[in-house]
Curated annotation (Swiss-Prot):
Domain of life where this protein originates: Eukaryota
Region (3-dehydroquinase): 1066-1285
Quaternary structure and partners: Homodimer.
Natural source organism: Pneumocystis carinii
GO MF: 3-dehydroquinate dehydratase activity; 3-dehydroquinate synthase activity; 3-phosphoshikimate 1-carboxyvinyltransferase activity; ATP binding; metal ion binding; shikimate 3-dehydrogenase (NADP+) activity; shikimate kinase activity
Binding site for 7-phospho-2-dehydro-3-deoxy-D-arabino-heptonate: 127, 143, 149, 159, 191-194, 249, 263-267, 270, 286, 355
Name of the protein: Pentafunctional AROM polypeptide
Length: 1581
């Protein structure tokens, strides 16, 4: 038997540790823990892995010893969902059925779920039986198996119910670790780190130094078949730290078993971590949650002034080494976290029921140092402090008046630039170097982590993290066998690109990959790569040209050396990268900087100076400009290298002193600094009126009185470009009445390609304070405001993930009159992670954390496109940009600009002639210039059409991408490329392409996609004809598209108001198959669902259709219907056809759905968690339906999984959709119980069971129920019903009672209204009846209005103007018209309300707009109305609403006309009774309306006047005449109008339109319009 280590807990040697323990365990059972019945409880995963071996040993030893004990087994499903009341009851019932008694011994074999559950069963079964823990996961070994805690989960929280019941034995068998996956292994490491960091400083230091080695081996175990030998490499080290962790926990539990004080320390990271785990379950593992929790609780300690900031950084570094998430932005974590709404408040709510809490005080373990806590128990912490740490954004309240003008002293964190250079130089050296004041930040972490993975050096921390000890390996680097992720660290990316050329080739995988964040993948690195490739290095771009990710193939030769030419006008880091690498080249390097004056020369000088400190002297040529000679050699490091403070960071506290009139000393940056930015005080602050005193190592400044900063005028900041943001903020309040107060900062063009486009960002964010600023070709101008007039920012400051922007605007926030919200506060982690703590503790700035959802203003300004932001159109020549751009300008009421046209205005010739005279390159530069101008000067209320080749220029692409990132809209107008080619081949007016058109398209299409936020797909039309006459259905679809993407579409809010709503599910491989049925099958529907996963191109049945094919079908459908569309990509895991394994492709397809302007996206939960924030930011008006389908079980309160899925969907969706299955009618009752318990009425939900027996759930669902139609060939899901079937069922169930509707008036016997409404009721299956009630007396209506079954009524002559006395209220429209034509009856607050409405005017407007569909405005037109009865009131109101003026009223009765004129009391109405009153009519008469009933003869004088109007010359070619008579289509007036070429709209058409509005008021749905229209008007209408 192997060596067994026994540890004591609570005075007993209960913990046994070793390898291959089955024989030992069996022996212990039979000798020390004997029982007649042993019960093994495990899960189905563990059962097959370990139970056979244990059973073999147990039976063998029992036989040898003649023991007859029973061995029983109970297996449960794996996972957190089994840790429930239900499972506990199942186990207990089974134990009783097996006649188990109090002498039974229960053995838990498994992870934490098994241990917790079985421990609780053991504690309560027979009032407590003995049990044994055999943990099979690292997490369970170091945490849950030790100490006796046990529990189950409830719907109210994790581990909500449980006891403390100590196991008889805990057997820790390291053999189990060998079978764990990498993720399972690392999940347990978090708990191990937690235990060690609170108790043992030396053990933590040892662990962090060896973590990379162990983690690397663990990762490699999954890549090799020889897993056992790999495991043996690390088992010795692992045993040490596992045993240390167990010892610590056992010691603490022995002192405080019941968790009164000391044991609460073991909850470090758990107060916040458990809450995170509960909110995000099941997608986040326990260890991952605890990892985040530890970091947040350590940050809380730092924020409260208890903990050295370096400790936080060391903890983060250690956790990250293992691949554990350390922030809500962590790449390994944000797939789940992004998009969670109310995340922080949810976490705080869960924390409020933490078992450690004392009354309402939240208790958290606070670290005071590594190995030491602030108290020997958890400490009370306020919600505000927790919220500040957890929140993504921070609200700054400014510096209190009593803190102004106080002196502060700041010791800066180490310089990022020097830290990263020192790290490289020390790693490449041949000795040991102590780096002091090393910066702990995101940027240096990425560098340090990458160098560790390259095995470039050995690293360890000393002096509580203040000193980093580096043992270099003389330039030897290994291939890490994994990609190196560098975040958004441009410094790291550029330096490592050269360093990685020194990596030794590896026989297994001879390449390595450098990658980074999305922004990093847009930042240029081309000049550096070009120089290295020209020197023989093998480097490839994996995505965009000139950007990360890079694939680097190491060579034996490494860097060749010799003459290297490098363009350094973009970044000095290119130069530093090659300089530092050059001593290890094969031949001596001569580095020549070409292409113009290098940018940021002081940083090149800094690198050279530091290389000298490490033993390599670089010589600058005296004869050749910008040329350097670098000798071969190996760096020799100094024993100690002190890193000075970060000079750029120094500008922020100094600027606070300057802007407030205070004083500040920086203790570790002075005149001797290597950093160019150290000159900021002398060159910027001093001229602005500050007193400046510098020693070699310190800087002191005192600001002038508040509001007295002097303007700089014009200043070139090329030598200190990163500090321009601080200067710009100060310039914004440098207001002097007697002097110019505009500051121009130049020489900073490189700031456009930093973490973001900083110049553009500064302009945008200053505007939020009311400060005018604008871009210059290589800089920015800022117009100052007097500080006393400085408005506060009502919107949050968008930091663009840029630390410099966050810190700069925090300076301005110090003097703001109201709180300022800084969004994405964690971006400062790049250089100064504890900047907010400095503001709070040193400058006394009050602050609190804030979420988007807590501040609607921030929500709208940041997450949504500005409502009037300028829209840019891009796309191939001939795609229709200009035509659609003009249309868009008309729809949205904006000005249209054609970029090509303004260029031609400037060059005074055509583009064709200009290109022939100069070149395409010259034209592209001109085009770029105007694009920059438009982006700067035309930010709102424009539609701008760009030339097809605008995206050929890299800088133009960057500008468009930046505009999109700033929530601008760029639409790619696309037409089938073959249609474009056909058209362009006949167009000789434009400059010819230099390449084949198809080749041009193939080159550009990726750029169009990258540079656009949206795409509108033009269906096949002849471009020439298209220009002349745009099809109405195309106009309509484009209008709906624009309304959706600009947020002017209120569809979602309208659906929410309905008592019942439905969407039609379409299951077709080709949508064109149902176009002819569309009007019929969508009757009563509020939306249409398109199942993209079912699309299939006939000739490509074995693969997914292309996005272009899908777009073509979708946009064809758009032209056939105005209903909103639901874009659904259902995967095989959820019952669909799209392979669940194709997750990356699925995301691409879904994001294109958003790009195409879909109103709704149905996204499955696991994908929704990853895409929510992207969609919410980039396409804020598209609503997400977060869906989960499980067709194997019903929805029930007893199933923890459904509760979790509901909570997840609530976070990720604007709409929740859960679909289970029914095997019995009772399952639907369980579903209703689930809804009653868990439904959050603020988030609408679709919760149904599928299958025939689930139909009841569909009937009972009220919001957006998926439906089918009998005209469709098949149902998309079993049990799906039509709207008619649902309404019929609701009626039978008594939930939809009969109603009667009436037409009141006289004469009405020939009315078509009963036919219209009854046909609508019949089609939709509504149990309603519409009938005539002929009367001219309102007294006869009193009784009928109060019938129980009365639903509503139509009102016609002669009752329209006097029926209101019988009603409870009338609408504003009806009151303004003075006429009621519709009565509704609603139930409100226990009583029925009769309300009068008027839909006549709506019917008139709809009829006019349907005919003249896209006339944006009628304001330049006039019209006439014949008649003066009740209907004429609605006609007048309709024309006034359209903006038509003047309106001529024609009638023989002057009294009636005067009555109407005085009722409306407006000069827009001109009464006409006689012929002579028609003199001098100079208006454009476009619309005429007759309100005279069919059976009333027209007075001859009125007819003569009408003839004059019909014959008046109109500016437009068409006039529209509406004859509201419902009888014959031919009247005297229509005959005259037709003869004068007026278009006629007959009375029945208007009746149908206003009846449709009545139907909507009564039923909440539009009438099946085309079916009713066909039946009433006939097929020709």
């Amino acid at each position: 038997m192997k060596e067994i280590i026994k540890l004591s807990i609570l005075g007993k040697d209960s913990i046994h540790i070793g390898l291959h323990l089955w024989p030992h365990i069996t022996n212990e059972l039979f000798t020390c823990i004997f029982s007649p019945t042993y019960v093994i409880i495990t899960d189905s995963n563990i059962e097959t892995l370990y139970i056979p071996s244990f059973k073999t040993y147990f039976i063998s030893m029992a036989k040898q010893r003649s023991i007859n004990s029973r061995l029983l087994f109970f297996t449960i499903p794996p996972g957190e969902k089994s840790k429930s009341r239900k499972t506990k009851a199942l186990i207990e019932d089974w134990l009783l059925s097996e006649k188990c008694t109090r002498d039974t011994v229960i053995i838990a074999i498994g992870g934490g779920v098994i241990g917790d559950l079985v421990g609780y069963v053991s504690a309560t079964f027979m009032r407590g039986v003995r049990f044994i823990q055999i943990p099979t996961t690292l997490l369970a070994m170091v945490d849950s198996s030790i100490g006796g805690k046990n529990s189950i989960n409830t719907s109210y929280g994790k581990n909500a119910i449980g006891t403390i019941w100590q196991p008889e034995r805990i057997f820790i068998d390291f053999t189990f670790l060998e079978t764990l996956t990498e993720k399972e292994f690392i999940n347990g490491i978090a708990e191990l780190i937690k235990t060690i960091i609170i108790w043992d400083e030396s053990e933590f230091a040892s662990l962090e130094n060896i973590s990379e080695k162990i983690a690397k081996t663990v990762r490699s175990m999954s890549l090799t078949s020889n897993k056992h030998s790999k495991f043996n490499e690390i088992i010795k080290d692992l045993k040490r730290y596992i045993i240390s962790s167990i010892k610590i926990k056992a010691h603490i539990v022995s002192i405080d078993e019941k968790e009164k004080d000391l044991r609460t320390l073991l909850n470090f990271g758990h107060s916040i971590g458990h809450a995170i785990e509960t909110v995000l379950a099941p997608y986040i593992l326990h260890g991952e949650s605890i990892s985040i929790g530890m970091v947040k609780e350590a940050e809380l300690s730092r924020h409260l002034g208890i903990l050295n900031p370096n400790v936080v950084s060391r903890l983060i570094k250690c956790l990250n080494t293992w691949g554990l998430p350390t922030s809500f932005k962590d790449r390994r974590f944000k797939e789940v976290i992004l998009g969670k709404k109310h995340l922080i408040e949810d976490i705080l709510e869960i924390m409020s029921i933490d078992k450690k809490n004392d009354s309402n005080n939240k208790k958290i373990v606070l670290l005071s140092a590594i190995g030491k806590t602030y108290e020997k128990k958890a400490s009370s912490v306020s919600d505000d402090d927790i919220r500040t740490i957890l929140s993504q954004n921070i609200l700054l309240y400014g510096i209190p008046l009593n803190a102004f003008q106080k002196h502060t002293t700041i010791t800066l964190p180490g310089s990022k630039s020097i830290s990263n250079r020192a790290l490289i130089l020390a790693s490449l050296s041949n000795g040991i170097c102590y780096l002091k004041n090393f910066l702990h930040s995101d940027d240096t972490y990425y560098m340090l982590s990458a160098l560790e993975k390259l095995n470039a050096a050995e690293f360890k921390w000393e002096q509580d993290g203040d000193v980093l000890v580096v043992k270099g390996k003389s330039g030897y680097l290994e291939n890490p066998q994994m990609e190196l992720y560098l975040g958004n660290s441009g410094t790291t990316a550029r330096f490592l690109t050269s360093i990685c050329t020194l990596v030794q080739p590896n026989s297994r995988e001879n390449h390595l990959i450098l990658t980074g964040s999305n922004r990093m993948k847009q930042r240029p690195i081309g000049p550096l790569v070009d120089a290295l490739k020209n020197n023989g290095c093998c480097i490839e771009y994996l995505e965009l040209e000139n950007c990360l990710p890079l694939l680097i193939k190491p060579k034996e030769i490494g860097l060749y050396g010799g003459n290297i030419n490098l363009s350094a006008t973009v970044s000095s880091q290119y130069v530093s990268s090659i300089l530092m690498c050059s001593p290890y080249a094969k031949t001596q390097v001569t580095l020549s900087l070409i292409g113009g004056k290098p940018i940021s020369q002081p940083y090149i000088d800094m690198t050279i100076s530091m290389m000298s400190s490490f033993g390599i002297k670089v010589t600058r040529s005296h004869s050749k400009e910008n040329t350097y000679y670098i000798p071969k050699g190996c760096y020799t490091c100094p024993s100690e290298y002190i890193i000075e403070g970060d000079a750029t960071s120094a500008t922020y506290p100094l600027a606070i002193a300057a802007i407030t009139g205070g004083s500040c000393t920086i203790s570790n940056v002075g005149s001797a600094s290597l950093q160019g930015d150290s000159k900021f005080s002398e060159y910027i602050l001093k001229p602005m009126g500050c007193e400046v005193v510098q020693s070699p190592t310190t800087t002191y400044i005192k600001g002038p009185p508040k509001g007295k900063l002097k303007s700089l005028g014009s200043i070139n900041m090329e030598s200190m470009t990163d500090t321009f943001l601080t200067a710009a903020v100060l310039a914004s309040v440098a207001y002097e009445e007697s002097k110019p107060y505009v500051t121009k900062i130049t020489g900073i063009s490189n700031q456009r390609i930093k973490e973001c486009n900083r110049i553009n960002a500064m302009v945008c964010e200053l505007k939020k304070f009311g400060i005018e600023a604008g871009e210059l070709p290589d800089g920015i101008y800022v117009k100052a405001l007097n500080t006393s007039n400085l408005p506060y920012s009502v919107e949050g400051i968008n930091c663009y993930n840029d630390h410099r922007i966050a810190m700069s605007f925090s300076v301005l926030a110090c003097i703001s009159s109201k709180p300022t919200t800084i969004l994405d506060k964690a971006c400062v982690n790049k250089t100064w992670p504890y900047w907010w703590d400095i503001l709070n503790s040193t400058f006394k700035v009050q602050m609190k954390g804030i979420e988007f959802d807590l501040n609607p203003t921030i929500n709208s300004s940041i997450l949504h496109h500005p409502s009037e932001c300028t829209i840019f159109l891009i796309g191939m020549r001939g795609a229709g940009k200009t035509t659609l751009g003009q249309l868009a300008a008309n729809f949205l009421g904006r000005e249209f600009i054609d970029l090509d046209s303004i260029i031609e205005e400037d060059i005074k010739t055509t583009i064709l002639e200009f290109i022939q005279k100069y070149s395409w390159d010259v034209f592209r530069r001109k085009e770029l210039h105007f694009l920059k101008t438009l982006l700067t000067e035309k930010k709102e209320n424009y539609i701008i059409s760009c030339g097809g080749g605008i995206i050929e220029t890299e800088e133009a692409r960057d500008l468009l991408i930046s505009y999109i990132e700033a929530n601008g809209i760029v639409i790619h107008i696309h037409r089938n490329i073959q249609d474009i080619i056909k058209y362009l081949n006949t167009d000789k007016t434009r400059a010819p392409y230099q390449d084949n058109i198809m080749h041009v398209w193939e080159r550009r299409k990726r750029w169009y996609n990258l540079c656009s936020s949206h795409q509108f797909h033009m269906t096949s039309t002849d471009p020439t004809e298209f220009k002349k006459n745009i099809p109405l259905n195309l106009k309509s679809s484009f209008n709906n598209f624009l309304r959706t993407i600009t947020g002017k579409n209120n569809i979602f809010s309208l659906i929410l108001k309905k008592k019942r709503s439905y969407f039609l599910s379409l299951a077709f491989s080709d949508l064109e198959n149902i176009f002819s049925l569309l009007d019929i099958i969508t009757a009563g529907c509020d939306a249409i669902e398109i199942r993209i996963d079912l699309f299939q191109k006939p000739e490509e049945i074995d693969k997914y259709p292309s996005l272009e094919y899908i777009a073509e079908k979708i946009f064809l459908l758009r032209q056939k219907t105005s209903l909103p569309l639901i874009y659904t990509l259902r995967t095989t895991n959820h019952g669909g056809s799209f392979l669940s394994s194709e997750k990356k492709l699925a995301k691409e397809y879904i994001l294109h759905g958003a790009k195409w302007g879909f109103e709704f996206l149905d996204i499955e939960l696991d994908i929704a968690s990853e895409l929510f924030k992207t969609i919410n930011n980039s396409w804020p008006y598209t609503k997400i339906i977060a869906s989960y389908h499980n067709i194997e079980k019903p929805i029930s309160c007893d199933d923890f999984e459904w509760i979790q899925k509901y909570k997840e969907a609530q976070h990720y969706g604007h709409i929740i959709k859960l679909v289970g299955t029914s095997s019995s009618i009772e399952d639907n009752f369980f579903l209703e119980e689930f809804k009653s318990k868990f439904i959050n009425k603020k988030v609408p939900s679709i919760i149904i069971n599928t299958g025939i027996k689930g139909q009841l759930s569909r009937i009972m669902n009220t919001f957006m129920t998926p439906v089918t139609h009998p005209s469709l060939p098949s149902k998309i899901a079993p049990g799906q019903l039509s709207i008619k079937e649902i309404n019929t069922a609701l009626h039978i169930m008594g939930l939809l009672p009969e109603k009667k509707y009436f037409l009141f008036g006289k004469p009405i016997k020939h009315s078509q209204s009963p036919n219209i409404h009854n046909l609508g009721f019949e089609i939709l299956g509504l149990p309603y009846k519409y009938q005539l009630f002929e009367t001219d007396s309102i007294s006869e209506l009193k009784e009928i209005l109060h019938l129980e079954e009365f639903g509503g009524a139509s009102v016609t002559i002669p009752l329209k103007t006097n029926i209101s006395i019988l009603l409870d209220e009338i609408s504003d429209h009806a009151a303004l018209i003075g006429s009621v034509n519709t009565i509704t009856r609603t139930y409100n607050n226990g009583q029925y309300i009769l309300k009068g409405e008027n839909t006549d005017w709506q019917g008139i407007i709809k009829a006019i707009k349907n005919f003249n569909k896209f006339e944006k405005s009628f304001e330049n037109f006039s019209g006439f109305i014949i008649g003066a009865g009740g209907a004429s009131r609605a006609a007048i109101y309709a024309l006034l609403s359209l903006g038509i003026s003047p309106i001529y009223l024609i009638n023989r009765s002057k009294d009636k006309l005067n009555k109407l004129y005085h009722f409306f009391n407006t000069n827009h109405i001109i009464p006409i009774t006689e012929y002579h009153e028609l003199n001098n009519i100079n208006f454009d008469i476009r619309i005429g309306i007759s309100t005279i009933p069919t059976d009333n003869p027209i007075d001859p004088s009125v007819l003569e006047i009408a003839k004059i109007f019909f014959n008046l010359k109109r500016k437009s070619s068409e006039g529209i005449f509406l004859d509201m008579a419902y009888g014959s289509n031919t009247t005297d007036l229509t005959i005259i109008a037709k003869a004068c070429n007026w278009k006629i709209i007959h009375g029945l058409e208007i009746l149908l339109e206003q009846g449709s509005e009545q139907f909507l008021l009564w039923t909440e749905t539009y009438i099946p319009y085309n079916q009713v229209k066909y039946a009433i008007l006939g097929p020709n209408k």
